[in-house]
Amino acid sequence: MAEGSGIDRKAEERMEFTTSKEVTVHPTFESMALKESLLRGIYAYGYESPSAVQSRAIVQVCKGRDTIAQAQSGTGKTATFSISMLQVIDTAVRETQALVLSPTRELATQIQSVVMALGDYMNVQCHACIGGTNVGEDIRKLDYGQHIVSGTPGRVADMIRRRHLRTRHIKMLVLDEADELLNQGFREQIYDVYRYLPPATQVVVVSATLPYDVLDMTTKFMTDPVRILVKRDELTLEGLKQYFIAIEKEDWKFDTLCDLYDTLTITQAVIFCNTRRKVDWLTDKMREANFTVSSMHGDMPQKERDSIMQDFRQGNSRVLISTDVWARGIDVQQVSLVINYDLPSNRENYIHRIGRSGRFGRKGVAINFVTSEDVRILRDIELYYSTQIDEMPMNVADLIA
């Protein structure tokens, strides 16, 4: 199913937007005055009508307005800016006209595939420019000419410095998952890229969470942005059941996880740890106990990560142990259970993690392992998202089945 084509409409009706006054709602894609070839791609991709964020943001972005769009996972955010980029580019000019920066390689690759699918009838060129891949291939593709580049900040900045990614025709910069991008790790690289862009470049910021420091940051490179925002207390996904299990000692988490495996009939599950070392340790422990699991983190070679993702997408592996590299926008339909073996060290990542389950209105369950040291973090998450996380009931298997 295409992202957004199975959006929970009932949940959407209850969603309250805090949005700039000039934003109008376009209830159909036809009413947005999009190119005929793009409309064909949208319908072929599985969309029938725009989601709440799409119906508000696409026309504003196509008008050339700097835009801050905030909507929860699974509401069609990726397609919002993909459709907008495809509308404004001129495919007769084989130069990069739109640039998307994402915090992870997987997300950048996924965006490329969405752009190519939506632009199927437009003869569009789109390249994923990401670290961990062959530089020579990047250079060849960029020298050939790409209308849209989706990439990670480091590799994109490198290709611009080497003058293979030509910036003079760029008219739109999209920062996807901006909260993560603008965290300290990527801030300087984004500034590096931004310095090379034409002064009139339109900036679009898209994210599920927009902490105040991120909004403050956007003032540096946005002019009078139009805002399309969901109130923060609406951000926890509808249809998700959130539980915690109180565990006395860190050492007992593993036994608790094994007990859960015995009682749950799981379609697909993701288990999150905070460090790469913990992912490797837990993967080894689970395999020693004869549980079949796969694992992924940022230290792995890109080819290996791609292969693991593909296996998981196709349902060949059922349980994936990962760090937050997986938590940002990766679109796997079947995930019905998320276990936070470690609570996220950054509370903004909580929604990205649990947003993995129950996408597009599917039921999903999130289970948080909580030691006495974690109680304060759990309460902080509850307050931040205005949500309630209950102790896990005995019949949790029935809720997932």
Curated annotation (Swiss-Prot):
Domains as described in the record: The Q motif is unique to and characteristic of the DEAD box family of RNA helicases and controls ATP binding and hydrolysis.
Compartment list: Nucleus, Nucleolus
UniProt keyword Thylakoid, yes or no: no
Protein family per UniProt: Belongs to the DEAD box helicase family. DDX48/FAL1 subfamily.
Gene Ontology CC terms, in alphabetical order: nucleolar chromatin
Keywords from the named record: ATP-binding, Helicase, Hydrolase, Nucleotide-binding, Nucleus, Ribosome biogenesis, RNA-binding, rRNA processing
Every Helicase C-terminal domain range: 239-400
GO molecular function per UniProt: ATP binding; ATP hydrolysis activity; RNA binding; RNA helicase activity
Motif stretch (Q motif): 27-55
Source species, domain of life: Eukaryota
GO biological process assignments: rRNA processing
Motif (DEAD box): 176-179
Class of this enzyme: hydrolase
Protein name (database record): ATP-dependent RNA helicase FAL1
The protein's role, per its UniProt record: ATP-dependent RNA helicase involved in 40S ribosomal subunit biogenesis. Required for the processing and cleavage of 35S pre-rRNA at sites A0, A1, and A2, leading to mature 18S rRNA.
Chain sites annotated for binding ATP: A71, Q72, S73, G74, T75, G76, K77, T78
Span of domain Helicase ATP-binding: 58-228
InterPro entries noted in UniProt: DEAD/DEAH_box_helicase_dom, Helicase_ATP-bd, Helicase_C-like, P-loop_NTPase, RNA-helicase_DEAD-box_CS, RNA_helicase_DEAD_Q_motif
Pfam families (alphabetical): DEAD, Helicase_C
Reaction catalyzed: ATP + H2O = ADP + phosphate + H(+)
CDD domains from the UniProt entry: DEADc_EIF4AIII_DDX48, SF2_C_DEAD
SMART domains for this protein: DEXDc (SM00487), HELICc (SM00490)
Annotated EC: 3.6.4.13
